[in-house]
């Protein structure tokens, strides 16, 4: 018996209902079918590896208030995350970069029309109890320790990850700060196929498209932060240039570097910009304070939900703070900022 016909209905009514079906019955059937076959939305969030800890927490907060949503998080090098959107048709709904300028230079205007600057970081040198000279290294002698024959240090690829090119910028800035013109040559040039050009007070590091001829007895080089962290912990090598927040999150020991070279402070921006770096794709980056950027790409499948995720981040700055990444409050925004976010943002041109 048709479930939409009340018990006790006349036989003729039953037959007609079975043969032809009523309009109301059809409508109800369609509605129920839709409810059964509609899949919940899964939001795809792509972000720099150094954001893994806070973004795990942001996912929990977001899902608490959007219980019909799934979240797929994907960490990687910022350049790789963006290139997947541009070249591989990746449909990330949220993109967060460890270098805000990558959004403006690589994504705008075709793949994004706005972004926010929302948190900062700085470069430190992390180590473990297994590291050689762990009891001797400090903020004044680190470049001498790294140059010792039985010391191996690591950083991520400058062609793939902002932390990689920032690590090299830090080493180059050290030459200027300590007034020792051989630091970059001793640590980088002698052990890689990198180059450097010095002109009019500006030092430009040159990274070839193909990084090769790495002295693997001296340097541990991988594409992403996750690939360099575990080997450090297990004693594969001794020291790692990494973000302070990541070192804190992984309970690593580290030495802090002078503010003049660690890329962590706005007041030293004029000093930082004395160093530039040209990556393998020919793009030149100027050293500047480490500031994260976030956007919802134009290619996102779920624009509205992506904006809601960004709003969740802005509503809960304590998550970034607890992860060792000081927030910029209010966030600084550029471009066509969504209306839902404007109350949290200082918009600039």
Curated annotation (Swiss-Prot):
One annotated GO biological process = molybdate ion transport
Q: Which UniProt keywords apply?
A: Signal
Q: Which Pfam families match?
A: SBP_bac_11
Report the CDD domains cross-referenced here.
PBP2_ModA_WtpA (cd13540)
Origin, by domain of life? Answer: Archaea
Q: Which organism is it from?
A: Methanococcus aeolicus (strain ATCC BAA-1280 / DSM 17508 / OCM 812 / Nankai-3)
Give the residue range of the signal peptide. 1-25
User: InterPro entries, per this entry?
Assistant: ABC_trnspt_W-bd_WtpA, ModA/WtpA
Q: Which residues cross the membrane?
A: none
Q: Which family does it belong to?
A: Belongs to the bacterial solute-binding protein 1 family. WtpA subfamily.
Native organism taxonomy:
Archaea, Methanobacteriati, Methanobacteriota, Methanomada group, Methanococci
Q: What name is this protein filed under?
A: Uncharacterized solute-binding protein Maeo_1470
Q: Tell me a Gene Ontology molecular-function term this record carries.
A: tungstate binding
| SUPFAM superfamilies, A to Z | Periplasmic binding protein-like II
